[in-house]
Design a protein with these regions (language model features):
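A detector for short, charged/polar N-terminal pre-domain segments
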Residues: 1-7
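Generic intrinsically disordered, low-complexity segments enriched for polar/acidic and small residues
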Residues: 5, 13-14, 28, 62, ...
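Canonical Radical SAM [4Fe-4S] cluster-binding loop centered on the CxxxCxxC motif
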Residues: 7-45, 58
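Conserved alpha-helical segments that form or flank metal/cofactor-binding pockets of metalloenzymes
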Residues: 68
Length: 132
């Protein structure tokens, strides 16, 4: 099995798509926080419209779903399906990993190219302190 990761280089095009601001954690370093950003969630129609804007370059674009915590979005599975149908080069979900089982219940491995998990410390104590 060939090891792969999303290419973050001058030659690659990466679309970082924040589909909601809500999160299940309160990480000390996070730039998206409840006080500033509230709990906004894009509708599936809005997600489809935005993806449509970039669809002409989809075959050359790595799509990364972000948040907040994207696994909290009620239509994440549908958004992944829409992106797949548009032919994006790769589809990634960037997650804190706490709701990983929810992803596996709704999205098949064939629909997704990568998961990106954040780890915020080398010990449980450090990780938990940072994540609030």
């Amino acid at each position: 099995m060939k090891k792969q990761t999303v290419a973050f280089s001058r030659q690659s095009t990466n679309l970082f798509f924040h589909i909601l601001t809500r999160c299940n954690l309160r990480c000390a370093h996070c730039y998206i926080n409840r006080e500033q950003h509230g709990s906004n969630t894009l509708s599936l129609d809005t997600i489809r419209e935005w993806l449509g804007i970039f669809s002409s370059k989809a075959k050359d674009t790595n799509l990364i779903f972000l948040g907040g915590e994207p696994t909290l979005h009620p239509d994440l599975a549908s958004a992944v399906s829409i992106a797949g149908a548009m032919g994006f080069k790769s589809i990634t979900i960037d997650t804190n990993g706490f709701l990983f089982h929810n992803i596996l219940d709704n999205i098949t491995p064939a629909q997704l190219d990568f998961f990106s998990f954040s780890l915020d410390g080398v010990t449980k104590e450090t990780n938990d302190a940072i994540r609030g």
